[in-house]
């Protein structure tokens, strides 16, 4: 046929059997990728330290999605929450991966069958004998079935009525686990961070889908609407389907980047806004203040801070710190976290407590500045020592650690104090192993960043695809130069001007 690469899909334009076949093959490819990717990730995933080396630090992409839907155990004998298990059951990580690969193989065979047996009676219009699809009826069927699936997911899977529930955690990502969720029917259901909204919205949307599907199955569209929206043209289906997909992609890019109950930080890592707003830092200070109010010493109060909470308060876990072309996991960047050194408290020679000003998200380097409780600069690491007035040496800054591995250790040596001041710019201080993975010390993004970038990019691309195919189907007659409502018999090539009998060729 000699079609250019960008027109090859016209081969299925008027061929319903093979149109179905290529869509089944597409499903086979997607399911096959998902299953294969899951097996690859399971082969390289290290489940030994869920606190300091969680899945998102290791660059896992499909494991978090399985986990949020209720999968936590592996046939390898480990659980995502730590510890060992003896009977993971069929719906383990490997079981889900295997099910996808099996489904992919069945879809592959079905696609081949439908490619060979394309001329089925079901696709033939009994009036004309030509291949035809009743698109409004197919729309109703798909709407009904997707509504049924949506309702079932919300009413059974999420609620735990028949299923495991979903991953639910506290606001600081410390106590996450899979549990049943009750639907939230009040105004709180519209809070994107309330898990109950996931159940209630799926139940509501599913009910609407079922009713809308039944409506479209029982009511035919008016003729003027049918013609006006080109409901008989398969490219209309393509255009509106692309619209649904790009809209969904934009929505999930937002829920992933800004955070929501559907994207827990234990599975996808923290958001950049939690660093920008000092979200974890405030909670840590609140807990320490509570401890001090209960007559605990500074050392005791800081020692009770969970290592998991301290680790979130580290700039290396900020997804916006990774560069666009820095491939690999976070562990390949700043290394594998080994342990929390503790919280450094800086003081000048007058005994004032000093706080290191933290590095903003979009800086690669930042001056080391220490301020007191009133925000007044008291010390720094100067660029020009000759002009310095606030250098660590001049001010006599010391550092003492509370909690962590260096609990109770203090330093007054200026070089050591400056070293820890520089590291305190990046949040809580952790020992990082860069040797194991030959990590290069350059920050990487988390799967949260990759997912957002990918979905926002494809959403934009698909938006233009929707405009393109929508315009093609709405203005098909204009582009073709033929009026679709032309009733008179036109013999192509009989007239010099198409359809004008006064210009008959001799």
UniProtKB/Swiss-Prot annotation:
How the cofactor is bound: the record states: Binds multiple chlorophylls. PSII binds additional chlorophylls, carotenoids and specific lipids.
Cite the entry's keywords alphabetically: Chlorophyll, Chloroplast, Chromophore, Membrane, Photosynthesis, Photosystem II, Plastid, Thylakoid, Transmembrane, Transmembrane helix
- What do the Gene Ontology cellular component annotations say? chloroplast thylakoid membrane; photosystem II
For this protein, the parts annotated as crossing the membrane are 21-36, 101-115, 140-156, 203-218, 237-252, 457-472
Example GO biological process: photosynthetic electron transport in photosystem II
Does the keyword Transmembrane feature in the UniProt annotation? yes
Compartments annotated for it: namely: Plastid, Chloroplast thylakoid membrane
Report a single Gene Ontology molecular function. Answer: electron transporter, transferring electrons within the cyclic electron transport pathway of photosynthesis activity
Which pairs are disulfide-linked? Answer: none
Membrane topology recorded in Swiss-Prot or TrEMBL? Multi-pass membrane protein
Where primarily located? plastid
Q: NCBIfam families, alphabetically?
A: PS_II_CP47
In terms of HAMAP family, this protein maps to: PSII_PsbB_CP47
Family, according to the entry, reads as follows: Belongs to the PsbB/PsbC family. PsbB subfamily.
Q: Describe the protein's quaternary organization and the partners it interacts with.
A: PSII is composed of 1 copy each of membrane proteins PsbA, PsbB, PsbC, PsbD, PsbE, PsbF, PsbH, PsbI, PsbJ, PsbK, PsbL, PsbM, PsbT, PsbX, PsbY, PsbZ, Psb30/Ycf12, at least 3 peripheral proteins of the oxygen-evolving complex and a large number of cofactors. It forms dimeric complexes.
Job of this protein = One of the components of the core complex of photosystem II (PSII). It binds chlorophyll and helps catalyze the primary light-induced photochemical processes of PSII. PSII is a light-driven water:plastoquinone oxidoreductase, using light energy to abstract electrons from H(2)O, generating O(2) and a proton gradient subsequently used for ATP formation.
The entry's protein name is Photosystem II CP47 reaction center protein
């Amino acid at each position: 046929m000699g079609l250019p690469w960008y027109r090859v899909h016209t081969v299925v334009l008027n061929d319903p059997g093979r149109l179905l076949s290529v869509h089944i093959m597409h499903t086979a490819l997607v399911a096959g990728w998902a299953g294969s990717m899951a097996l690859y990730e399971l082969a390289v995933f290290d489940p030994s330290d869920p606190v300091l080396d969680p899945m998102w630090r290791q660059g896992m992409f499909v494991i978090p999605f399985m986990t949020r839907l209720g999968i936590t155990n592996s046939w390898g004998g480990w659980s995502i929450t730590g510890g060992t298990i003896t009977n993971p059951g069929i719906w383990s990580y490997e079981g889900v991966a295997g099910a996808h690969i099996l489904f992919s193989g069945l879809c592959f065979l079905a696609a081949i069958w439908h490619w060979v047996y394309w001329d089925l009676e079901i696709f033939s219009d009994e009036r004309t004998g030509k291949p035809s699809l009743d698109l409004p009826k197919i729309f109703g069927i798909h709407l009904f079935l997707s509504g049924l699936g949506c309702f079932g997911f919300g009413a059974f899977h999420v609620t735990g009525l028949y299923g495991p529930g979903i991953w639910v955690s506290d606001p600081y990502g410390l106590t996450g686990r899979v549990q049943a969720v009750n639907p939230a029917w009040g105004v709180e259901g519209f809070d994107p961070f309330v898990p109950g909204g996931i159940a209630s919205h799926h139940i509501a949307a599913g009910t609407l889908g079922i009713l809308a599907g039944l409506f479209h199955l029982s009511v035919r569209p008016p003729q003027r609407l049918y013609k006006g929206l080109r409901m008989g043209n398969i490219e209309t289906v393509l255009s509106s389907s692309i619209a649904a997909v790009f809209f969904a992609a934009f929505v999930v890019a937002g829920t992933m980047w800004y955070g929501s109950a559907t994207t827990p930080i234990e599975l996808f890592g923290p958001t950049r806004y939690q660093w920008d707003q000092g979200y974890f830092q405030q909670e840590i200070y609140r807990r320490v203040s509570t401890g001090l109010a209960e007559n605990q010493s500074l050392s005791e109060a800081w020692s009770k801070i969970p290592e998991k909470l301290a680790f979130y308060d580290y700039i290396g876990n900020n997804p916006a710190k990774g560069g666009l072309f820095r491939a690999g996991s976070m562990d390949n960047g700043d290394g594998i976290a080994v342990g929390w050194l503790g919280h450094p408290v800086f003081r000048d020679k007058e005994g004032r407590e000093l706080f290191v000003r933290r590095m903003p998200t979009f800086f690669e380097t930042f001056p080391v500045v220490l301020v007191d409780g009133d925000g007044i600069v008291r010390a720094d690491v100067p660029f020009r020592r000759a002009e310095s007035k606030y250098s660590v040496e001049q001010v006599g800054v010391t550092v003492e650690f509370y909690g962590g591995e260096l609990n109770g250790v203090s330093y007054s040596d200026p070089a050591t104090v400056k070293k820890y001041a520089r590291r305190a710019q990046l949040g809580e201080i952790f020992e990082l192993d860069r040797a194991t993975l030959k990590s290069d010390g350059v920050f990487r993004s988390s799967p949260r960043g990759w997912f957002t970038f990918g979905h926002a990019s494809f959403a934009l691309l698909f938006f233009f695809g929707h405009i393109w195919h929508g315009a093609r189907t709405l203005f098909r007659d204009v582009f073709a130069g033929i009026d679709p409502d032309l009733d008179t018999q036109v013999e192509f090539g009989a007239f010099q001007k198409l359809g004008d009998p006064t210009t008959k060729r001799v």
